[in-house]
From Swiss-Prot:
Chain residues that bind substrate: Y109
InterPro entries xref list: PsdUridine_synth_cat_dom_sf, PsdUridine_synth_TruA, PsdUridine_synth_TruA_a/b_dom, PsdUridine_synth_TruA_C, TruA/RsuA/RluB/E/F_N
Catalytic residues as annotated in Swiss-Prot or TrEMBL: D51 (nucleophile)
Function: Formation of pseudouridine at positions 38, 39 and 40 in the anticodon stem and loop of transfer RNAs.
Identification of the protein by name: tRNA pseudouridine synthase A
Amino acid sequence: MRIALGIEYDGSGFAGWQWQNGKRTIQAEVERALSRVADAPVRVTCAGRTDAGVHAIEQVAHFDTESRRSERSWLLGANTALPEDVRILWVRETEPHFHARLSAIARYYRYEILNRPMRSALRPRQFTWCHAPLDVERMREGAAYLVGEHDFSSFRAQQCQSRSPFRRVHFLHVRREGERVIMEIAANAFVHHMVRNIAGVLMAVGAGKRDPAWVGELLAMRDRAKGGVTAPPDGLYLGGVCYPEEFGLARDAVFEHLPADARRYQPDDES
């Protein structure tokens, strides 16, 4: 039996999603809690392995089990065993061929910037702080260069192990809500540090340090060394994952902006 689940977490106190020997990780906590409910070892596979300090509004994962439990029992039992900074939001029995990572049509990330002279005393690790005033219109102009299918070599970490630097960005929105500047981006997949590198570049543009056209120039250079500063993980959230309707999983309203021809990432599509 294959089970899908949605997970929310505050990544501040974790070394990332993926299990690491001797370190606190989300995967380890989730597997421990589910194994307790199953009364047997459980191994989970997630849609996107977030780095240290990165949060999730809705991470999606799946696991296989022979233990028969109701969806409610999985949900309540696992949450009872989880620490306060991790919560399972929903549990669904799904198709045997569902795969949290490989079945995804798109992933959505949200980057939140606290744009004011002083840092936050209440939520210091839930925003990235920028004291310089940010011009959202300039950031939008720069963001427009990144929408579509491109070689994102200038925006991926040098240690990125992906076979291809090509990704398709479906949308990249920037808006202001009071003291916060919010960037929302959806793509068929992301290279390592892609969202944080884009955020760092757009913050430089918004602060007036660079012109919006610089974003297009960086894209054309295909050189990470020219790509500016990687923004901190604090403001980054995995917002949600979109799957084909056949799996019956609810979609975040943000995915209404996806193009009709959006499909899952295939590394062999790019050459």
